[in-house]
Structures are given as structure tokens and as C-alpha cells.
Amino acid sequence: MQKLTGNLKKHRIMDALIYGISRKTAIFETLRFRAWLFTKKLKYTSNLNPIVIGGCPRSGTTLARSLIGIHPEIASPKNEYNILMWIKNNNILESIFGFSAEEISTLKTKHKDLACFAENVLKLYMQKEGKQVVALKHPFHIIIIDELFRYFPNMRFIHVIRDGRDASCSLRTHPKRKMVEGEIVPNTTKNPFDWCIRRWVSCINQGKKWRKSDKYIEVKYEDLVNDPANTMEKIFKFLGLKAIAEDKLLDFYKYEKDEKHLQNIEVGKPIYRKNIGRWKKDMTEKEKEMFKRMAGRLLVELKYENDLDW
């Protein structure tokens, strides 16, 4: 539990940059969530079956949500939203779901338990969108996957996985932007490379525990990029939904609203293939050896390499 909440604190600070809220607020939300995990007994279990998308940051969860979100039966907010984190932040509820102040007040008055509150947030959103299925994307869903399955045992979890070398290279300078007084501005980030590797390994291992569940699926970012039609057919079959025509899939970006936020800055753009294999030019020989030592065997297990001779 200490490791989980420690990871959450780091992620909350990153979210603070993205959402433009103070670090103080981010830490407060972390402590509230931690207190709930420690003290809340399993009093409420939701029957809702949301589609939950997660994975190591910079692994393609935004692309996965964009492709899933164009399905006519699915309601999916364009901005990332963690189903059990930030759920009582008024600004986020308003900006992501379009809830009015009155609707938010009613939700908070009626539902004190976090899991119950989250369920009713999703129900209200589906009602407003006229849909029967909801999909939510946030990279850090993978960090709390155990808690999510505990309170939403019927959820379908889509774990997006990317070559750890590319993900680590991207994580090193993430986030590149931050929100200041409502404006998106450049942000200089230099995360330690070993931290980036550990983050990727941790996220992969969190998901591996659920491989035997029929409500969990792993999807490679590279497959989404190189073969979106067949990959999405596999995903929609997993979700029990009809597949979408290939031409509509490839034009997914045309269906997104022209509104940019830090979490979805790539929204509205076609599939970009050039970042696959970026590690070949980004990583030094020393960093390659570091990755082999820390995560090389996991890379082989995921079939990104046949051995450590790369």
C-alpha cells in the first residue's frame, strides 16, 4: 500500500501540471484517496461495466481511447479521467463531463462513498450522452487496477503496452506542457532515465497479474498504429461490440471535437508512425545497457526482442 500511494503522489504532481491545479490540491487529493483505501471496508460494489483504458504514460492510451470512442454505442470523454481519482473535483467534473454546478452538488449530496459516487458520475454522463456504455482513459488506471476490479468487478480493462525503450524515452521529457492561468505553456521536464524505466516495468507488472481474467486484455501500441483495423476488431470483440468499418477507423481524428487540453493534445491528428523505434536515436549506449539490466528480460517476454543482443 505504501508503494502504491507513493506512486500516486508522484502521479498527482504530474496531473497538477496537466490540470493547472495547485500541488497543494494534488497532495490533498492523494491523501484523501489514501485514507479511503486504508479505512473503507468493501461496503459498495458497483454492477456497472465501464470500459477502462490504462497503461504506462506515453504508451498510446490516448490513441486507444480515440479509436474506441468513435464507436456509436460508446460514450467517452475526450479528456482523460481516472475513475477513482479526482472524482470530486468540481472543475474537472465540469470540464470533462459538462456537468452543471447543480448536478455536481446533487451527486455529492446523495453519494458519500467514492465508488458509489464514481458509479453515479458515469451513469449521469451516459444518460446525458444517450449511450449505454462508457469508456474512460487515464494512464494511471493501471496503477490502481486492483482497486478498480475490487469496486468495479464487471469492468473491461484495456491495457495499452508500448515498447519500453520508446516509452522511457518519451517519459523522460513528459510533461512537455503545463497549464498556467488557463493557458497551455511549454514546460521543461527532465525525468531520470532509470525512473522512466522503473515506471514502465511497474505498470507492465501491475497488469500481468490480471492476464487470466476474461475482463482484461493487452493491446500493443505498435499494433494500433500499424494494423488499426484488425487490432480494433479484436478489441471490439473483447467488448462484445460490432466492429467499425476500416475507413471510419482511419478517419477517427475527424470525429474528435476541435478542443485541445494538455492530456489530449494529440487529439484531432491522424495516426503517427514515426515515433516507433525512436529509442534507436534517443538512447545512449550507457542507457541501452541500463535498460537491458533493468527491463531487458521483460522486453523479451513481451516479444519486442528475441534476446538482449540489440
Model-derived features: positions:
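PAPS-dependent sulfotransferase catalytic core
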Residues: M1-A118
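PAPS-dependent sulfotransferase catalytic domain
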Residues: I27-F38, K110-K128, I161, R165-L241, ...
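Short His-Asn-centered micro-motif
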Residues: G54-G55, L136-P139, Y221
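PAPS-dependent sulfation machinery
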Residues: S66-D146, Y151, R177-F193, Y272, ...
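Conserved phosphate-donor/acceptor-positioning beta-strand/loop module used by diverse small-molecule
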Residues: K137-H138, L148-R172
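The conserved 3'-phosphoadenosine-5'-phosphosulfate
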Residues: R211-E285, E289
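C-terminal accessory extensions appended to soluble enzyme cores
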Residues: D282-W310
